[in-house]
Amino acid sequence: MKKVFSSIVLLLVLSLANSFAQNKPAAGTTQKATVPISYGIVVDNSGSFRSMLDRIIEIAKDIVEENKADDETFLVRFVSTDKISLLQDFTVSKDELHRAADEMYVEGGLTAILDAVDFSARHLVEKANSEASRRKLLILLTDGDDRQSKLKIEEVLKFLKDNQIRVYVVGISEEKVSTKIIDRLTKESGGKKFVPKTLSEVPAIIKELSTTIRTP
């Protein structure tokens, strides 16, 4: 009887050891912790994107595809101050966000990047999940050329800092991305700027962005 009992105990120990070995990260690798995020994708729909709109829509969708189960996202399109629209409120549904992205369209107007960021930041504060561990941020897709925002950058930055909202920018342009405003928005809010030299670099940048925004 003792031999049988000893054999059972040995089998249990071996089983637990095997289970631990299977779940243990491989040597030389680490498992990165991630935090849940509440964020808005804020997309420039001004005339300078007329020939690039399809690509911009795909970039927005690719960002959404990186979402984790606990992430919640809203989508804003903008041109001028009076043409800032919430296309999709907070949702965890990738399908809803994809459908909203397909509704984007280019139109004329004096681009108001700062006003769009302020609009989106205030929506984020008002509607986001209030979990303490949840990171709040905005992802801005733009060429960086602000033509006529009513707000000054100092006003926008104060609201971002007061509410611990980080801004990340994917700078896209057929010519040259204007970095004066987006440099301040990203650096002073604790975010980061990504400017691909060619569109072929965008997929890798989206992967890097996804990791960056979710790493504590």
Q: Over which residues does each language-model region extend?
A:
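Exposed acidic/Ser/Thr-rich ligand/metal-binding surfaces
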Residues: N23-A26, I37-S38, V43-S46, D54-K61, ...
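An active-site-proximal "capping" alpha-helix that borders the catalytic cofactor pocket
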Residues: R55-V76
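A short acidic, often aromatic-flanked loop/helix-cap motif at beta-alpha or helix-coil junctions
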Residues: L199-A204
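Membrane-proximal juxtamembrane linkers immediately C-terminal to transmembrane helices
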Residues: Q31-V35
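Bacterial N-terminal signal peptides
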Residues: S7-A17
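Positively charged n-region of N-terminal signal peptides that target proteins for export
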Residues: M1-F5
